[in-house]
Design a protein with these regions (language model features):
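PLP-dependent enzyme catalytic core of the Aspartate aminotransferase-like
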Residues: 1-11, 133-134, 142-144, 160-163, ...
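Conserved PLP-enzyme active-site core in the AAT-like
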Residues: 2-19, 26-35, 93-294, 299
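N-terminal "arm"/small-domain region of PLP-dependent enzymes with the aminotransferase-like
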Residues: 2-75, 83
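Glycine-rich beta-alpha junction loops
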Residues: 31, 45-51, 200, 222, ...
Length: 406
């Protein structure tokens, strides 16, 4: 009869997915049906939850029985997203955050203390550098930077108080790589952890935990969403470390909203399909750009000219969607190139179905001192294109407008 509900058969829950493939996990992992038997992922908009009795409330707050307490702690929609990410990354547990930067903040603040030492790759996102240099150092955490690809440099820089190694691979925006498995061995041999920002690849192209990393962080704002709609982040790893991260997030509060979690669940359903299309377009554009006058250098691991092309082939399932290149004319040339485009969006975001273009040295890395940008390899002539899903010939035509303006 219409309007009546029935108990859902627990034996038919989609959470029984042992042994299935990546695409199946991306569509069905983490789904928990309510008694309504809905087929889609439900959104739970609530700040708090009702307890049956005072004793029930006390038991839940004490962690003696499972159940939701408060949406700063847990939310069913957010939990579904966390479980799906954990399944895709091969993690024991994942926890969602309000932004990608909140994910990095949570990892360092929960696992490091004053007097601990952290090693960071030089080629990381500008805001990540600011977070480590301007804030973590203020709390007594020592920070040093190491060239990403130089394994011997990492080994030599580890101190007795080194708590973690933090890397982006591929890096933003130069697409530099590190051998994750080899770096994990170095870290573990000296009793420290390896944290990998997997934003550029997503688990569709790379699963750092399966290569030996301890924790993975993401800006879900990028490719996990895939359409530039909302912001979020996620941390995934072993339950031992994740317990500390969860505790920090529940106390500090940079948690993900259920609406954004629902958007990310929808994004994950098409993640693998989208990443294949992104990679195909990016490969075509990188090869085309490498042949053009006015282009001094193209940074894309899918090119045979890239010094880490073989590592990318071995470590990743695709070369990613971000193509960076250096043009003649320095900053003025880069700005003329960008301003001449008509189809591509001038915006600092990436991972969108719409192709975006930006000038890193005056946007994402603009707050860094000139010497910091130089150390990170961010030159004034550098342009970053996050390749979307448009017809590649239209993208080539738009970039040709930029070339004509040089």
């Amino acid at each position: 009869m219409g309007g009546m509900t029935q108990e859902w058969d627990a034996g038919r829950l989609d959470s029984d997915l042992e042994g299935v493939g990546f695409d199946t996990l991306a569509v069905r992992a983490g789904q928990h049906r309510t008694p309504e038997g809905e087929h889609g992922d439900p959104m739970f908009f609530t700040s708090s939850y009702v307890f049956r009795t005072a004793a029930d409330a006390a038991a839940r707050f004490a962690g003696e029985v499972p159940g939701n307490v408060y949406s700063r702690y847990t939310n069913p929609t957010v939990r579904s997203f966390e479980e799906r990410i954990a399944a895709l990354e091969g993690a024991e547990q994942a926890v969602a955050t309000a932004t990608g930067m909140a994910a990095t903040l949570a990892v360092v603040m929960s696992l490091c203390s004053a007097g601990d030492h952290v090693l960071v790759s030089r080629s990381v996102f500008g805001s990540t550098i600011s977070l480590f240099d301007k804030y973590f150092k203020r709390f007594g955490i020592e920070v040093d930077y190491v060239p990403l690809a130089e394994l011997s440099g990492w080994d030599a820089a580890i101190k007795p108080n080194t708590k973690m190694l933090f890397v982006e691979s591929p890096s933003n925006p130069l697409a530099e790589l590190v051998d994750i498995a080899a770096l994990a061995e170095i870290a573990h041999a000296k009793g420290t952890m390896l944290i990998v920002d997997n934003c550029f690849c997503t688990p569709a192209l790379q699963q750092p935990l399966l290569l030996g990393a301890d924790i993975v962080v993401h800006s879900a704002t990028k490719f996990i969403d895939g359409q530039g709609r909302c912001m979020g982040g996620v941390v995934a790893g072993r339950s031992e470390q994740m317990k500390e991260v969860v505790g920090f997030l529940r106390t500090a509060g940079p948690t993900l909203s259920p609406f954004n979690a629902w958007i990310f669940l929808k994004g994950l359903e098409t993640l693998n399909l989208r990443m294949r299309a992104h990679c195909a377009n990016a490969q075509a554009l990188a090869q085309w750009l490498e042949q053009q006058d006015g282009i001094e250098k193209v940074h894309y691991a899918g090119l045979k000219s890239h010094p880490q092309h073989e590592l990318a082939q071995r470590q990743q399932k695709g070369f990613g969607a971000v193509v960076s290149f250096e043009v003649k004319g320095g900053k003025d040339g880069a700005w003329r190139f960008i301003d001449a485009t008509r189809l591509i969006s001038i915006t600092a975001n990436l991972g969108d179905s719409k192709t975006t273009i930006t000038h890193p040295s005056t946007t994402s890395h603009g707050r860094l001192a000139p010497q910091e940008r130089e150390a990170a390899g961010i030159r004034d002539s550098l342009i970053r294109v996050a390749v979307g899903l448009e017809d590649v010939t239209d993208l080539q035509a738009d970039l040709a407008r930029g070339l004509a303006a040089l």
